[in-house]
Regions:
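Mid-domain alpha/beta scaffold segments of enzyme catalytic cores
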Residues: 1-258
Length: 258
């Protein structure tokens, strides 16, 4: 098995010692993971960069300003983000987007910071990693206005109509452990609708552990359960899901996988 975890947060304090986590990931069949550096204050992106630099054969970083933190981001933060995302080892901009479920930042601030990161991704020619919750129409509108056509909707939990919109823009959909949960029929219908060659699998570690690990801290090794559920929903083998989703991640993030 050669899986890629397309979105994890190994830089957070929940993973004070990443070494055993990475060992378990390799033992489970993972060959790479995308570590998503989030912004909570000055210096936060450094954690993801340092961890990825220590394990370049297994981890690749992306950097962004999460919508929860949009109101806190300063012009200096945005300048730092642009300068750092221009580095070749940074594979994408984000996660960036809109979150109307929690609304931790005013929606106007979320939209402004999201738009700026969309523009940055286009300027740098890098993919955009999108976080969107209860805001699909506004998110799709901004993507269209800026002209972003290369990216991934991380932890996609929308309905078929939302999936169709993003797929029509050329985006990938990344699926988390949520697809293994009960009462997610609408999401599962969207997964059945989406072509396998536009899908990825992720953990969003340490959050959203899939069944049978739900309720515990998530980690990259658990992405196997999400891949297994995806195979069930698509009516294909786990090997097929592994091959295709890994190829998708490699294509979007420009990964040289061995």
């Amino acid at each position: 098995m050669r899986l890629v975890d397309a979105h994890c947060h190994l830089e957070v304090k929940d993973f004070a010692d990443a070494a055993p986590v990475l060992e378990r990931a390799r033992a489970a069949g993972l060959i790479h993971a995308i570590i998503v550096g989030q912004f909570h204050g000055p210096g936060d992106w450094g954690n993801a960069l340092e961890l990825a630099a220590a394990h370049p054969e297994f981890l690749s970083p992306t950097l962004g300003i999460h919508p929860h933190e949009a109101a806190r981001a300063t012009e200096d933060d945005l300048a730092t983000l642009e300068r750092t995302c221009a580095r070749p080892e940074v594979r994408a901009v984000g996660e960036a987007g809109l979150d109307y479920y929690y609304d931790h930042s005013p929606r106007e601030a979320q939209a402004r910071i999201f738009r700026l990161q969309c523009e940055l991704a286009v300027k740098l020619g890098k993919p955009l990693v999108v976080h969107v919750r209860d805001a699909h129409e506004d998110c799709d509108a901004i993507l269209g206005e800026v002209g972003v056509s290369k990216g991934v909707i991380h932890c996609f939990t929308g309905h078929t109509d939302a999936a169709r919109r993003y797929l029509d823009r050329g985006f990938y959909l990344s699926l988390s452990g949520v697809i293994t949960y009960k009462k997610t029929e609408a999401l599962q219908d969207a997964v059945r609708f989406a072509p396998l060659d536009r899908l990825m699998v992720e953990t969003d570690s340490p959050y959203l552990a899939p069944v049978p690990h739900r309720g515990r801290k998530n980690e990259p090794s658990h992405v196997v359960e999400t891949a297994r559920k995806l195979a069930e929903l698509k009516g294909v083998t786990l090997e097929t899901v592994t091959e295709v989703t890994t190829a998708n991640a490699a294509a979007l993030f420009n990964l040289n996988l061995r």
